UniProtKB/Swiss-Prot annotation:
Subcellular location: Endoplasmic reticulum membrane
Known EC number: 2.4.1.-
Gene Ontology terms: biological process: attachment of GPI anchor to protein; embryo development ending in seed dormancy; pollen tube guidance
Enzyme class, spelled out: transferase
GO cellular component: endoplasmic reticulum; endoplasmic reticulum membrane; pollen tube
Transmembrane feature ranges: 41-61, 98-118, 146-166, 169-189, 204-224, 238-258, 260-280, 294-314, 320-340, 342-362, 392-412
Lipid bilayer topology: Multi-pass membrane protein
Keyword Oxidoreductase included in the entry's annotation: no
Protein name: Mannosyltransferase APTG1
Tissue: Mostly expressed, mainly in vascular tissues, in leaves, roots, stems, flowers, siliques and pollen, and, to a lower extent, in seedlings.
Species of provenance: Arabidopsis thaliana
Keyword annotations from UniProtKB, A to Z: Endoplasmic reticulum, Glycoprotein, Glycosyltransferase, Membrane, Transferase, Transmembrane, Transmembrane helix
Record keyword Amino-acid biosynthesis present: no
Record function comment: Mannosyltransferase involved in glycosylphosphatidylinositol-anchor biosynthesis. Required for the pollen tube micropylar guidance and embryo development by regulating GPI-anchor mediated protein localization (e.g. COBL10 and A36).
Length: 548
């Protein structure tokens, strides 16, 4: 087996990125030498992510639907619910517009059927995910060589959380793809003596787009930008001729887009940062202790890759990327409101270190070498025999991550999506007149899945200016029967369908009978509780006289 031969622009380093190693050309183990050309790698990743997208049938977080698809649906079809964030101007239209183009294509081709409307957005996201996979391979190859790149790609595809989350339509997912792409082009991350300014400009463009889509991405690019500023010999040129013009162009473009869509001038990044960082507005949706990312959140995402990532960080001695992970986790730890997806952009970086550890094990087992990037050439072995340690490690990761990925993607919290898919099909057949969701706000997808302009009502949870004031969701959970009875007093005509969790349904059965509702479908939702009491199933009720 070849161990990649490289030229070191900064002396005889130990193979980490801080050693500034570069390619000497397309040798057998150079980029793509292990598993094919960039095109073949991309097509392989795309096929994998398409299957990945089709396997995701669960609900994770409301923003997947309410902050992207719902907005895009309203833009193209003229109806859809805009949450309070859009009324306060803390969201940019840049990300939803990607899906608006998809919806427009489906509209003009007449393909906007219930099934395609449900599946198409995640299939579109699978293209972005595959691009991210390709650039993870390219970045790993630029840093450490083709062997590490192959293992890094394996780790990316085997990680349960990447499988579960990356193909969802969160802005965080596109931010993650742009982060990996951008890091590939920045000279301070990898030595790039050829076409140096062009690479950096591309890196700046991608970084600016990431910040436009997700303003908190500035946490990542502030670190990278300061590192580049420290290392570049021409600091004035970097700031005056590159950062300011490129940043201004991207900011200007997004401001014009938001001006067109909002109808007035809105500086979204400023509003977003003010709400989330200065006023801690996100705390309304719950808080975690400062150490949560370090002791729970990021470790759950890495799962059984954790020891391998730690080993890779130690062995590679790549202080730049390991410090980036630490920086992001530390900054996000300052905020009270924490979520797994907020730190998703640095998960692939941690998986690169896992790939390094696996490549180290492979090389150590096959040639007794102590370094993945050792300059020595070893004759190619067509069939490299894995050491027992390497084989056991691979089996261990697959045995732990595959069941987790499939369970979370196919079973855990699937009831709300199943219920909406059912209602979408019923509405398509003209069997739904109106829907009331008696469950915590944003528990289901909305018009982007139903795709029929019929009256729907859910329980509002807009943050209140009065501290301690209960929103509709909280009021309902405190007293389900009293809240539902108050709603019913104002009905001129009852909704044709009511959707609720089984935990509340048991308290409202008499109410349902009294108002002539009967159960029509029940969907499994979860085996264990997450934030609230166990929501084991989602129940759909229909009023008896809704249809003759």
């Amino acid at each position: 087996m070849d161990i990649r031969k490289r030229k070191n622009a900064g002396g005889d380093g130990d193979g980490g990125a801080d050693g500034a190693s570069v390619n000497v050309g397309d040798e057998p183990d150079s980029f793509g030498g292990r598993i094919g050309s960039p095109r073949r790698i991309f097509l392989f990743c795309l096929a994998f992510r398409v299957v990945n997208a089709l396997l995701i049938q669960t609900y994770f977080n409301p923003d997947e639907h309410w902050q992207s698809l719902e907005v895009a649906h309203r833009t193209i079809f003229g109806y859809g619910y805009m949450t309070w964030e859009w009324k306060r101007g803390i969201r940019s239209y840049l990300h939803p517009m990607l899906f608006a183009f998809l919806y427009k294509l489906l509209q003009v081709t007449g393909l906007d059927t219930p099934y395609i409307m449900i599946k198409a957005p995640r299939l579109m996201q699978s293209i972005f995910s595959a691009i991210g996979d390709l650039y993870l391979y390219k970045l790993s190859d630029a840093l450490y060589g083709g062997n590490v790149a192959t293992w890094s790609l394996f780790c990316q595809m085997a990680n349960w959380f990447i499988f579960f989350c990356l193909n969802r339509t969160f802005s965080n997912c596109l931010e993650t793809v742009l982060t990996i792409m951008g890091l590939y082009y920045w000279p301070c991350i990898r030595d790039s003596s050829i076409d140096y300014p062009v690479n950096r400009k591309w890196g700046l463009v991608i970084a600016a787009l990431a910040c436009a889509i997700r303003p908190t991405s500035a946490v990542i690019w502030l670190y990278v930008g300061m590192l580049e500023l420290f290392l570049t010999p021409n600091k004035v040129k970097f700031i005056i001729l590159e950062v300011i013009p490129i940043g201004s162009l991207v900011l200007g473009f997004t401001c014009l887009l938001d001006r067109l869509m909002y109808g007035s001038w809105v500086i979204v990044p400023l509003n977003f940062l003010k709400f989330n960082f200065l006023s801690s507005g996100g705390d309304y949706y719950g808080t975690h202790p400062w150490h949560w990312y370090f002791t729970q959140g990021f470790l759950v995402m890495l799962f059984t890759f954790t020891p391998f990532s730690i080993a890779g960080i130690i062995k590679s001695k790549n202080q730049k990327l390991s410090a980036l992970i630490l920086w992001v986790l530390a900054i996000y730890s300052i905020l009270g409101h924490k979520e797994f997806r907020f730190v998703l952009p640095v998960l692939p970086i941690a998986l690169i270190f896992s790939g390094y550890a696996f490549a180290q094990m492979e090389v150590s087992g096959s040639s007794s070498s102590s370094s993945v990037t050792k300059k020595k050439q070893v004759p190619r072995q067509n069939h490299t025999k894995w050491s027992p340690k390497l084989r056991l490690s691979v089996y261990f990761l697959l045995a732990t991550n595959i069941p987790m990925a499939l369970y979370m993607s196919l079973f855990h919290q699937r009831g709300t999506e199943d219920a909406m898919n059912y209602l979408s099909d019923e509405a398509y057949k003209g069997r739904v007149k109106s829907i009331l969701f008696l469950m915590p706000c944003h528990s289901t997808p909305y018009y982007s899945t139903l795709h029929r302009n019929i009256p729907m009502q859910f329980l509002d949870c807009t943050p209140s200016a009065e501290k301690g004031e209960l929103d509709e969701s909280d009021q309902f959970l405190v007293n389900p029967l009293g809240f539902a009875s108050e709603l019913a007093r104002n009905w001129s005509e009852p909704p044709s369908h009511i959707v609720l969790f089984a935990s509340e349904e048991t308290k409202l059965r008499d109410f349902m009978i009294q108002h002539s509702f009967k159960e029509v479908r029940r969907f499994f939702h979860a085996h264990f509780k997450v934030d609230r009491d166990l929501q084991s199933s989602v129940v759909v009720y229909v009023v008896n006289h809704a249809f003759p």
